[in-house]
């Protein structure tokens, strides 16, 4: 689950008539819930027969560092990194 849990996320905030994507840290409870949510969500999209097989394959992929849930986490981190210049706007 540690390979899936996000450290940062971006939140939209309207400042001066413009929306900014502001990176912020994720609380530990939210990290865990997002990680589990993504794990189940991407396991459901897999092509194996039963949900047990889908979930097992997604967990194995996440442990090895690939899989859709890990890609989602990397995408979120990339977005936060790209918008790092707006970090001084507090949430």
Curated annotation (Swiss-Prot):
InterPro entries with a match to the protein in the record:
Ribosomal_uS7, Ribosomal_uS7_bac/org-type, Ribosomal_uS7_dom, Ribosomal_uS7_dom_sf
Question: What's a BP term from Gene Ontology annotated to this protein?
Answer: translation
* Molecular function, one GO term: tRNA binding
CC terms in the record's Gene Ontology section:
small ribosomal subunit
So which domain of life are we looking at?
Bacteria
Which residues pair up as cystines?
Answer: none
Alphabetic keyword roster: Ribonucleoprotein, Ribosomal protein, RNA-binding, rRNA-binding, tRNA-binding
What PANTHER family does this protein's entry cite? RIBOSOMAL PROTEIN S7 (PTHR11205)
- Stated family: Belongs to the universal ribosomal protein uS7 family.
Subunit-structure text? Part of the 30S ribosomal subunit. Contacts proteins S9 and S11.
The protein in question is named Small ribosomal subunit protein uS7
Q: What is the protein's species of origin?
A: Apple proliferation phytoplasma
Q: What is the lineage of its organism?
A: Bacteria, Bacillati, Mycoplasmatota, Mollicutes, Acholeplasmatales
């Amino acid at each position: 689950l540690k390979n899936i849990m996000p450290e940062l996320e971006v939140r939209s905030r309207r400042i001066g008539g413009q929306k900014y994507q502001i990176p912020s840290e994720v609380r530990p409870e939210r990290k865990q819930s997002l990680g589990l949510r993504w794990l189940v969500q991407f396991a459901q999209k897999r092509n194996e027969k039963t949900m047990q097989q889908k979930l097992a394959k997604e967990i194995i992929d996440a442990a090895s560092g690939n899989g859709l849930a890990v890609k989602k986490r990397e995408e979120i981190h990339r977005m936060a990194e790209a918008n790092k210049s707006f970090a001084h706007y507090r949430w």
